[in-house]
């Protein structure tokens, strides 16, 4: 059964950095969730306007469908970056064919802010952090996953991530 790892958290938490490092270790398909947004969603976020549930649903469904397609093609693992802020959003992703795990990156907020302020050319702005924090719901008991609070270097975070993956007995 395909093991899907959703690297989740608010903007600037390091999702892409961790996902790319995981992809190098697991040699599996990787989807950058930002690439699945419509231009309208990107424009909205770029203007500092938070997305609503209606904006997010088709985006989440496209990610879910990509995950299921990878499972149908025999992928052992997949890695997806996605904020996955609400339980209801994660429920959509959990409909994918295979087993879905959430790796919630939750470094201190100042680390997120610093990363966001140093980004060049990304549509998300540091001003979006608060709206994402307001929306964020912690993982629930019915959701498989781990919360990683480290603000360390990417390789330190990867040790924790791979510890979780290996504990699943599926690496």
Kindly label every feature range from the protein language model:
Residues 96-115:
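Conserved phosphate-donor/acceptor-positioning beta-strand/loop module used by diverse small-molecule
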Residues 15:
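Conserved lysine of the Walker
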Residues 4:
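Walker A (P-loop) ATP-phosphate-binding motif of ABC ATPase nucleotide-binding domains
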Residues 7:
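Hydrophobic anchor at the beta1->P-loop junction of P-loop NTPases
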Residues 11:
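The conserved Walker
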Residues 20-62:
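Conserved substrate/cofactor phosphate-moiety recognition/catalytic segment
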């Amino acid at each position: 059964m395909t093991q899907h790892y959703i690297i989740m958290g608010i903007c600037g938490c390091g999702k892409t950095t961790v996902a790319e490092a995981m992809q190098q270790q697991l040699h599996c398909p990787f989807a950058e969730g930002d690439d699945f947004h419509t231009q309208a969603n990107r424009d909205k976020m770029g203007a500092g306007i938070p997305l609503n549930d209606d904006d997010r649903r088709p985006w989440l469904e496209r990610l879910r469908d990509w995950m299921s397609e990878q499972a149908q093609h025999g992928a052992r693992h997949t890695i997806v970056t996605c904020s996955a802020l609400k339980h209801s959003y994660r429920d959509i992703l959990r409909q994918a064919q295979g087993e879905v795990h959430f790796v919630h990156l939750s470094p201190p907020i100042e680390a997120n802010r610093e990363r966001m302020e140093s980004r060049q050319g990304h549509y998300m702005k540091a001003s979006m952090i608060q709206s994402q924090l307001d929306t964020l719901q912690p993982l629930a008991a019915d959701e498989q996953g781990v919360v990683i609070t480290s603000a360390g270097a990417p390789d330190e975070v990867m040790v924790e991530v791979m510890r979780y993956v290996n504990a699943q007995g599926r690496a």
